[in-house]
């Protein structure tokens, strides 16, 4: 008779898995102290010790294995994670334990470093020069300076004109109308009917400044070209359009604002967000009295002398920014991504999930909460990628990659209409062939598009 050749490693793995299934923590500890490399080893069906513990309802074993650093994102041959298994068999305590575990091994398909990138709305032509906002004499002098640039807004929509070139997207090139003091002198004479915001000065000094030709004394010339955003009333805007037939106010904001040149878009993002704040905070949030504009449009001050907001520094006096997490959720095995859609989206459009950060919440926890609320999918590891100002009216989109630790989708219809897992091949086809496919994603100037592209790019061998 021929003897059966033993496989000591296979026997050790089998013993490890049996101990996990039986809930024997002491035996597990002994095996792993001798052979720690067996922690994430799988059986023939792709199951790990963590999966066996989850299947048989042993929270103490699950906790022990998590503390040892086991990889909870691994999937078996049935495409299930340990969390999927625990949820299926009704072990809620274990499912919560797996979903909320901190740290752990970083998924293999995430890169260690993310290259810094500039998204649309984040580039600009200007240096904001916040040091000039308190200098009322300087601001007043710049208002009538011949080189000063004014951007006109009506209902938060910028005044633009069509350029002579065509962009690759076949959309006509849209450019901001850069007005000068004579164009807006009449509006500036009626400060109660306008909103004026100092945006900054041009990053590049102009050569051959026409300042002296405009009557500016040489000793008062500093060479700085100031830009202002000027919000006017709808009636005045209509009258202006009638006198300038080549100009119009860009509307609706989405997707119209995506037609701007990149550096001009950054200026509009700044201007639109501050103007939106002014339109919403005409009265003091503390006492309800009227407010007045100061610091070049970057502060509103209550006119009531006894208002508590005048004592110390209060965030209600300054423009607000609303932080939003937007995340590319990646399947535990790294081969798929989760995209969703809202009812208001164009038919066929899917994008990254997103949501506002709540008070007292970290970016990572906001990502996990929003993904679970909208799709029912639980997320483990979260990695920051890049951010994008989003002037709708004043959000900051914080882009992240998020690795799922469960795969079952349970859409909350009050949050979104649909959510699905898409393969890398499907996403690549959409990025290269656009709307010829069964679904499409936001345009390249949206951070969602860049997050999706980032995920595709970091998996070149899949």
UniProtKB/Swiss-Prot annotation:
Annotated ANK repeat ranges: 11-40, 45-74, 78-98
Pfam families: Ank_2 (PF12796), NUDIX (PF00293), NUDIX-like (PF09296), Zn_ribbon_NUD (PF09297)
Record-listed Mg(2+) 2 binding positions: 370
GO MF annotations in UniProt: magnesium ion binding; NAD+ diphosphatase activity; NADH pyrophosphatase activity; NADPH pyrophosphatase activity; phosphodiesterase decapping endonuclease activity; RNA NAD-cap (NMN-forming) hydrolase activity; zinc ion binding
Residues at which Zn(2+) binds: 284, 287, 302, 307
Residue window of motif Nudix box: 355-376
Motif (Microbody targeting signal): 460-462
Residues bearing PTM N6-succinyllysine: 10, 185, 292
CDD domains, alphabetized: NUDIX_NADH_pyrophosphatase_Nudt13
EC number(s) given by UniProt: 3.6.1.-, 3.6.1.22
Family named by the database record: Belongs to the Nudix hydrolase family. NudC subfamily.
Function: mRNA decapping enzyme that specifically removes the nicotinamide adenine dinucleotide (NAD) cap from a subset of mRNAs by hydrolyzing the diphosphate linkage to produce nicotinamide mononucleotide (NMN) and 5' monophosphate mRNA. The NAD-cap is present at the 5'-end of some RNAs; in contrast to the canonical N7 methylguanosine (m7G) cap, the NAD cap promotes mRNA decay. Preferentially acts on NAD-capped transcripts in response to nutrient stress. Also acts on free nicotinamide adenine dinucleotide molecules: hydrolyzes NAD(H) into NMN(H) and AMP, and NADPH into NMNH and 2',5'-ADP.
UniProt-recorded name of the protein: NAD-capped RNA hydrolase NUDT12
Organism field: Mus musculus
The gene coding this protein: Nudt12
